[in-house]
Swiss-Prot record:
Family that this chain belongs to: Belongs to the Thz kinase family.
Residues that coordinate or bind substrate: 43, 192
Taxonomic source organism: Haemophilus influenzae (strain 86-028NP)
Alphabetical list of SUPFAM superfamilies matching this protein: Ribokinase-like (SSF53613)
Function in brief: Catalyzes the phosphorylation of the hydroxyl group of 4-methyl-5-beta-hydroxyethylthiazole (THZ).
Protein name: Hydroxyethylthiazole kinase
Binding residues annotated for ATP, in chain numbering: 119, 165
Cofactor entry: Mg(2+)
CDD domains noted in UniProt: THZ_kinase
């Protein structure tokens, strides 16, 4: 099933400000990816700013990849402020199943902050759903659960949209579920490629006027198409892929999304 692009042009017209509390591995890549797409990144995790920055932003991304110092407190404060001013909040629960500190951080965030989108790999979402899964650090790992059911369960439990990234991506808001069949095997070879996807989703949510399911679906299709285009002619050249991915995000058009997107609903 093909899709019509609704939000990409709006991102480039509106240049939304994306507040990222992200990890030290992903910060540069996420910022450059957002710039390439047409959004404006703001990369701040200073707890002293968390009552102000969300008030000038259009969306907040909380990524727990490298929890340092007062990061958890900053995330909670920023999330609560974002909820107060009514901007969407995206959660990337990096490696939530790896340590008790990460699990407790996510438990507290989900209890105290309302999220518009939770984006993670299969292992991360299985952990949030309480399903048995053999995660490998921050990587997806292996398991035998129904991932569509996991996406729907988490979406219903927290009243949000869920995106599970993998060879086939799954998007659900608990009542409607779609799968995205674009992408490339080079994505897992580049660190922070999933973190950038969360940031890209945030840019789409920022201009979606509350239509978070359709915005997440288009964001996922757009990003995975950019990956396909970047990977053309490459096999193991992951360094070239990373740079070309930024170029393809900048070159992406609504027409390309409509022509190349492969989704099942």
């Amino acid at each position: 099933m093909l899709m019509q692009s609704i939000y990409l042009s709006k991102i480039r017209e509106q240049n939304p400000l994306i507040h990222n509390i992200t990890n030290i591995v992903a910060a540069n890549f996420s910022a450059n990816g957002l710039l390439a797409l047409g959004a404006s990144p703001l990369m701040s995790a200073n707890i002293e700013e968390m009552q102000e920055v969300p008030k000038i932003s259009q969306v907040l991304v909380i990524n727990i990849g490298t929890l340092i110092g007062k990061d958890r407190e900053a995330m909670l404060q920023a999330g609560k402020t974002a909820n107060e001013v009514g901007i969407p909040v995206v959660l990337d629960p990096v490696g939530v199943g790896a340590t008790s500190y990460r699990r407790e951080t996510i438990r507290q965030l989900l209890a105290e902050v309302k999220f518009a989108l939770i984006r993670g790999n299969a292992g991360e979402l299985a952990a949030i759903a309480g399903e048995t899964w053999q995660a490998k650090g921050v990587d997806a790992g292996q398991g035998e659960v129904d991932l569509k059911a996991v996406a729907e369960k988490v979406a219903q439990r927290y009243g949000c949209t869920v995106l599970i990234s993998g060879a086939v991506d799954i998007v659900s808001d608990g009542t409607q579920t779609a799968t995205v069949h674009n992408g490339t095997s080079l994505f897992p070879k580049v660190t922070a490629s999933g973190c950038l996807l969360s940031a890209v989703c945030a840019a789409f949510l920022a201009v979606s006027e509350g239509n978070y399911f359709s915005a997440t679906l288009e964001a996922c299709v757009a990003y995975t198409i950019a990956g396909e285009c970047a990977a053309q002619g490459l096999t193991t050249q992951v360094g070239q892929f990373q740079i070309r991915l930024l170029d393809e995000l900048a070159a992406l058009s609504p027409e390309t999304i409509g022509q190349r997107g492969r989704i099942n609903e």
